Amino acid sequence: MKYQVTVLGAGLAGCEAALWLAGKGVQVELYEQKPTHFSPAHKSEGFAELICSNSLKAERLDSASGLLKEEMRRMGSQLLNAAEVARVAAGGALAVDRDAFSAEVTRLVEACPNITVHRERVERIDESAPILVATGPLTDGALADEIGKLTGDERLHFYDAVAPIVTAESLDHEKVFAASRYDRGEADYLNCPFNKAEYEAFHAALASAERAPLHDFDTGAEQSARPDPDAHGKKADTVTVYEGCMPIELMAARGADTMRFGPLRPVGLVDPRTGHRPWANVQLRAENKDRTLYNIVGFQTNLKWGEQKRVFSMIPGLEHAEFVRYGVMHRNTFLDAPRVLEGSLCLKEHPNVFFAGQITGFEGYMESAASGLLVARNLYARLEGKVLPPPPVDTMCGALIQYLTTENKHFQPMGANMGILPPLPEESRPRDKRLRYMAAAQRAVASFQQWLDENAL
């Protein structure tokens, strides 16, 4: 064999990377801790185990997930082939029998002559040769400590809840206004002003909204605050949470004005429609450089997704908001990617150590698999003495890489969505959203293929 590479983790990213590298003649040493050690979330011994949903999302090219899949196909994804074998009917989405999918991926990996599987737990990273770490968001123990040392952190970045993200174009800009408090500095935030009646209706809906049950493995996360006193018998409230990540619905349950003196405080703001300070105010913070995506500030939540859509659409200006990511509450670990990763997804200070999958901040099944393909290409190029440029930013893979590696003080994981793609030129930008998404997808496919052709391996 010409080269040998170690891959840690046989999840979606690790398997996709191992299969691609093996196809290039690389001898892959693939380490998987199951069945000698299971995370609290994993149950089966198979590879590429899908923990939650069995949906791999939409297939239409004019959808973010469909575009990502097309880029993956052009890179030679074998997990998409496995998904076809395990496909179940799901309308316009690609859904799989999760056991059949895992079995097919496991079969592909174990049948590959260039992959040697080691069923054992790894606690140290040997950076004397290129190594790919794809151990997932539940990486723990000595390996998590090892990664923390390499990245300069005592531990990885833990969080318990994240807020939803909406697209800028779906906001009602007749109601939403740009301003900073007391007009200090740049108007970096968009503001959604409530009058008293609107706020009271919103508070009532939020306080009574249905919350999602936490998985058992989520309740074991490292947490540092007291149990919430307003439990109301709901499982989601019986766990402790970081005070700085308090779900907005728990804050609402503490009293009618709690949010108004917290993230919804209106001080220092004037609603240009009325000339007065709002009764309450929700702020939106840009999530990317192009300001096509906005985070609902302070709205970490554990509401069910349908409830988030219903209740958060009561915020003035968000009546028709398009949610590209709903808020979630669970345990997770991920790298501070903008600080520690190069565009090739190797560590800046330890260039032989590559990362792929959800531990990097790629959010989603297919996103994890796509990152495995991208990193495999970068790692192989390194072995060949080459340096690959990242995919263009007008592709889904390129936009995700740019998001992960661009400085961001509020960095959170991100999945594929059309909002992270740069806008189309105004003169050729269709008004119809579906046509606009198709035009962006066609541009992305052409750009991605050109990148592949110019960087053939």
List each language-model region with its residue ranges.
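A glycine-rich dinucleotide-binding beta-alpha-beta segment and adjacent secondary-structure elements
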Residues: I296-F362, A369-A370, P389-T406, F411-N417, ...
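Dinucleotide-binding Rossmann-like beta1-alpha1 core, especially the glycine-rich loop
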Residues: E49-E59, E84-A100
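Beta1/beta-strand and adjacent pyrophosphate-binding region of the FAD-binding site
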Residues: K2-A13
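N-terminal FAD cofactor-binding segment of flavoenzymes
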Residues: L19-N81, V393-L404
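Helical element adjacent to the flavin cofactor pocket in flavoenzyme catalytic cores
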Residues: R98-V117
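Internal hydrophobic alpha-helix adjacent to the cofactor/substrate pocket in enzyme cavities
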Residues: S368-P390
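Predominantly flavin-linked oxidoreductase catalytic cores and closely associated redox partners
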Residues: A111-R285, D290, Y294-W305, K309-R310
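C-terminal auxiliary extensions adjacent to catalytic cores
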Residues: M414-L457
